């Protein structure tokens, strides 16, 4: 398993041992391989004739077709993401303030 550690612990004030360079290189190569494989799959999907259209076909004709507009996508996609980021930022600021106060 790759050794990927931070130089300083998040919760205690103690410093951790330095991480190994070969472990970090192996982890970086694994991530690059995953991105490469994903890019190859997307490239295959986009350039293969008719594959994308076949995957997107709905086989059940009894189900109603639902199209999501920009407003609905914004309300149910972007707004929850921004609220989650705001909650994460508030927790991070609170932890930072608490750490500086000690």
From Swiss-Prot:
The keyword Transferase appears for this protein: no
Acyltransferase listed as a keyword: no
Alphabetical list of Pfam families matching this protein: DUF2755
Topological domains, Cytoplasmic: 1-24, 96-102
Periplasmic face of the membrane: 46-74
Chain ranges passing through the membrane: 25-45, 75-95
GO cellular component, one term: plasma membrane
Membrane association type: Multi-pass membrane protein
Cellular localization per UniProt: Cell inner membrane
Primary location: membrane
Keywords per UniProt: Cell inner membrane, Cell membrane, Membrane, Transmembrane, Transmembrane helix
Identification of the protein by name: Inner membrane protein YaiY
Taxonomic source organism: Escherichia coli (strain K12)
